[in-house]
From Swiss-Prot:
Native species: Verminephrobacter eiseniae (strain EF01-2)
Disulfide bonds: none
Function per UniProt: Binds directly to 23S ribosomal RNA and is necessary for the in vitro assembly process of the 50S ribosomal subunit. It is not involved in the protein synthesizing functions of that subunit.
Alphabetized PROSITE patterns for the sequence: RIBOSOMAL_L20
Protein name per UniProt: Large ribosomal subunit protein bL20
Keywords carried by this UniProt record: Ribonucleoprotein, Ribosomal protein, RNA-binding, rRNA-binding
Length: 119
């Protein structure tokens, strides 16, 4: 069997890892052995936080809706219950956006909810 020299593949692999580690501080960005570990850890964090991001944004939307609803005399849970009873199917992301950027539209939704809760 012929001898296999791995200079080309090794260099390519090193270049790929170091490119992924670009911007890392210190030896994490320019020493292959350390950069490889840093890139693996960064990938783990990225995987974990793509899932965490969904939870964090949902919490943010609920906090914004709650604050806006309380200004108009309802708690978040009362507001959510009223939305369900009034058959208003707007998701939390859109409600939070309305609460921040279009107070009048959010206020009209709250009035519909209050009317439905009073019945």
């Amino acid at each position: 069997m012929p001898r296999v020299k791995r200079g080309v593949t090794a260099r390519a692999r090193h270049k790929k890892v170091l490119a992924l580690a670009k911007g890392f501080r210190g030896r994490r960005g320019n020493v292959f052995r350390i950069a490889k570990q840093a890139v693996m850890k960064a990938g783990q964090y990225a995987y974990r936080d793509r899932r965490t991001k969904k939870r964090v944004f949902r919490q943010l939307w609920i906090a914004r809706i709650n604050a806006a609803a309380r200004e108009l005399g309802l708690t978040y849970s009362q507001f959510a219950n009223g939305l369900k009873k009034a058959a208003i199917e707007i998701d939390r992301k859109m409600l939070a956006d309305l609460a921040v950027h279009d107070k009048a539209a959010f206020g009209s939704i709250v009035e519909q909810v209050k009317a439905r809760l009073a019945v």
